[in-house]
Amino acid sequence: MRNSVVAALVASFLLLLTHSVWSAQAQPPQKATYAGNEVCKACHAAQVEKFSKTVMGKIFISNPRNDLEKRSCESCHGPASEHVAKGGGKGVGIPVTFRKGTEESATAQNEACLACHQRGVQTYWEASPHAGRGVGCVNCHTIMEKTSDRFQLAKVDDKTPFFNKRAQTEVCGQCHLQRKAALQRSSHMPLREGKIACSDCHNPHGTPNPVMLKQASVNENCYACHTERRGPFMWEHVPVMENCGNCHDPHGSNNDRLLKLTDPRVCTSCHIYDFHPGTPRGLTSQFFFNRSCTNCHSQIHGSNHPAGKRFTR
């Protein structure tokens, strides 16, 4: 009887000891806490001063709208108590860093931004081609200092005029080299002049449309400016209604009016076997061969004239 009691006590003690050891091992590590903006400013005064001049800095420091924004530096970088306890240093004890050369993944960096920027133009970010290719917000935007009048665009070099729409062209052109090169062609959209920007046609944060177009189709995108081409027309030109890109290269061309080919070659790319009426050998007449089709067919985008079937009026 006595042996049974002793055995039971020993078993209970061992079970209690095992539970204590397991509990100690299972105990999660102490989480970092928020140190406060003044603690950050004690070491990073220059950075805080630059940040305070940005749109985001003015909100966080002077007019925070919620508890997250009140944390200022730690709103994006996370709790800094561990960073302070370890004496600071680049990347030491900081949950999220955004500096160049950091080992932080683009996904982790973007999550800090998406804590606030979830709606509006950022709605489709997670499913966007840029997110899928590991592009980080800081690849296009600068956080800590004001570099552009809008969008906190990343600074490419000291010569780039970052206070007009040309800034977007420079930022996008860092990756989209072919598109940037096309803008140097004789016929081009006025992006390099700063009259329009890439974001007038595309949403770089993602859309449910092809090639991140702001509108549902290429034509709808073009009609946003070229309203006179929208129609509906009594006589419609099918390739035009199908896709403006059938004839035009929107980023730039060495042909007039952004045409992919010279006129009439852009027409004969479809009208291969169409012989011109009134000529004995089709297009071999000196009055028609290699001449501009639009000299006569001037309403090529569509016509509302009762006799405009051939787009001549």
Language model: regions and residue ranges:
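N-terminal secretory signal peptides that target proteins for export/translocation
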Residues: 1-3
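Bacterial N-terminal signal peptides
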Residues: 7-19
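Short sequence/structural segments immediately N-terminal
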Residues: 17-313
